[in-house]
Amino acid sequence: MSPYRLALVFVLAAATTGCDFAARTGIVRDDMLVLTDAQKVIADTKINHGDMTIRASVDRADTTYGAGQPMVLSVSTSKNAHVAILRVLPNGSTTLLFPDKAHPKADIAANKTLTIPEPRDGFAVTADKPGVVLFEFVASTAGDAWLFKRAPDKDSDFADLGVTSRAIAKDIVDSLKVGKTGADTAATYVTVRVR
């Protein structure tokens, strides 16, 4: 084997190892590559303003679930806030998961973890079809946005917001009045893979 080919083999091996390491450690999130355009619109919404932070997670470190399998979501904020949790499916179908029928108030105390669903809630958060599901977590120190007041649909635990993610993203930002008031706003998201 010529020295050039040997060098090329080493470079390709190093690049492959580096990409695998980055994906495994979260430096590069491989799930970002599979978000649909409708999901990216929500994930890329510019909501963060002020110094409040938000943390979110699901109950599985590998974030992989079977179709129809229940998921447990957790969120906490660094300040007293109002929180909303959205589920965005690959086709853009968006559901407001929190506030919900069991928790009509969107309030969360600073540095306390909110878990949805809680064991006594009587409902489950699931995804029925394989693909990547985006969970967007939004918080504000002001509670006047429709996102924190929206009631669930009749005979449902949640509110269906439709499939127009671009319109929903714009409406969320407008309703939160990001940067136009003294309120802190923060958002983060978690993606899960449904197999």
Question: Could you tell me what each predicted segment is?
Answer:
Residues C19-R195:
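Secretory-pathway glycoprotein ectodomains that are cysteine- and/or Ser/Thr/Pro-rich
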Residues M1-L8:
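Bacterial N-terminal signal peptides that target proteins for export
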Residues F10-A13:
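Short, linear, compositionally biased motifs with a strong N-terminal bias
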